[in-house]
Swiss-Prot record:
Pfam family for this entry, one: Ribosomal_L3
Protein name per its UniProtKB record: Large ribosomal subunit protein uL3
Organism: Actinobacillus pleuropneumoniae serotype 5b (strain L20)
Gene Ontology biological process terms, A to Z: translation
UniProt entry tagged with the keyword Transcription regulation: no
Lineage: Bacteria, Pseudomonadati, Pseudomonadota, Gammaproteobacteria, Pasteurellales
Amino acid sequence: MIGLVGRKVGMTRVFTEDGVSIPVTVIEIEANRVTQVKTLENDGYSAIQVTTGSKKANRVTKPEAGHFVKAGVEAGRGLWEFRTEGEEFTLGQEINVDIFTDVKKVDVTGTSKGKGFQGGVKRWNFRTQDATHGNSLSHRVLGSIGQNQTPGRVFKGKKMAGHLGAERVTVQSLEVVRVDAERKLLLVKGAVPGATNSDVIVKPAVKA
């Protein structure tokens, strides 16, 4: 089963019949329109390309405009691709949130919030050094980052200060709390990566 592209609206909570509060993330999933169907014969693999939402006409490039016209769909805010396995799709077909009606758990992929350049304590949860006992300048520095003349270098991949966030993150096996097809909403238990209004990809859980 393929996934869908949605927009993170924010977090709230819902209550069970027993009065238990469940924290949920609200994901708005408007109709995903099929813009291209890729086949094993023509492209070497089977997939569909989709778009969702809308885009101002003056923001659509000429190649994009031609691509959308060929598919017979309204220009969307982006293009995403999902691999297919035996499912049949047609150009211009709309796929809605109700495909998740019988799904118990989903994987959600998004772009995490960017935090800029951060130190080792925030980025990697390093312990801080002594606040006193003669330490006056090195409270939050990394400490030793290598060995000696041998190997005489810092190993690749060493955890150090650097850019944090703004990367693709997937949270797996989030429980589907509610599917509201009428309002085009999907409620999943817990947090999903990304800022409010950012695009997220929702797929049936791999490990469900």
